Amino acid sequence: MNILMALSQLEVTGAEVYGVTLSNELIKRGNNVTIVSDTLTKKFDGEYIKIEFNKRGLFQRINQVISLLKIIKEKDIQVVHAHSRASSWSCEIACKIAKIPLITTTHGRQPVHLSRKIFKAFGRETITVCENIKKHLINELGVDKNKIKVLRNPIDTSYYPFVYSDLKKDNKIVSIIGRLSGPKGEVAYKVLETLENVSNISIQVIGGKEIPEKFNKFLNKSNIKFLGYVNDIPEKIKNSDLVIGAGRVGVEAILSGKPLIAIGEAQYIGLVSPDNLIPAL
């Protein structure tokens, strides 16, 4: 099958990791996969074509649709799979013109406004990564529940062997993993404010293409390091005593045997235990 994956991130996100992981597995199984996106950082085994979906002016949207139709025709694309609001808008129109199916994956909560309810752009079928997002789409955006399936983040578990943490050592390494923009950035900022003066904790902040100005107050703290984007997330999780994050990062931490404080954009779970594992997922 010839598949087109559409992303729109400006920095590495869970959606990119999801999309690339899925695409590489589809290629291994004999499919042809092309990715279109504003940027692409993770290693991808197929062809990447740049389309700047975050440029949302009318003429830019028209150019995006034209580019998509050209790719669909040249590569004989049979299905498009979009992973973001920005990309799904243009893909919805292109797929209707080309008369091919659009599948979408919703990785997080969506803005609720009238235009989103009128022009949903969720495709023929939509996938959500958890039950809470499914409920959100049904109750707040009016998406047909029969067109939604829950499929959790695809993770190669061979990268995340279970290793017990040594909680008796004096200095603990706390890893905050996620981008520093948007709601996740607000969460990271509040966590750093809370922990910055705790003497026996070393904090590593992983993720974020650039450090927002408001985080500058933490740059001179000897116990806080901003590592930016790193390729060896499994190794960083392995060397952590506590992970703070959400989404696929949370699942990766649990698989690795690391204590996890789950803080998402819309919900605070806290320290994940057997008692709250199901709602955390």
Where are these regions (language model features)?
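Nucleotide-sugar donor-binding and catalytic loop/hinge architecture
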Residues: 1, 161-173
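N-terminal strand-loop element at the rim of the active site
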Residues: 5-60, 208-215
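Acidic donor-binding loop of glycosyltransferase active sites
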Residues: 77-79, 235-251, 257-261
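Short His-centered aromatic/hydrophobic patch
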Residues: 82-88, 106
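Carbohydrate-associated surface elements
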Residues: 132, 154
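Conserved catalytic-core segment of nucleotide-activated headgroup transferases in glycan assembly
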Residues: 170-211
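Nucleotide-activated donor-binding/catalytic signature segment of Leloir-type glycosyltransferases, i.e.
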Residues: 207, 212-230
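Catalytic binding pocket for nucleotide-activated donors in carbohydrate/polymer assembly enzymes
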Residues: 251-281
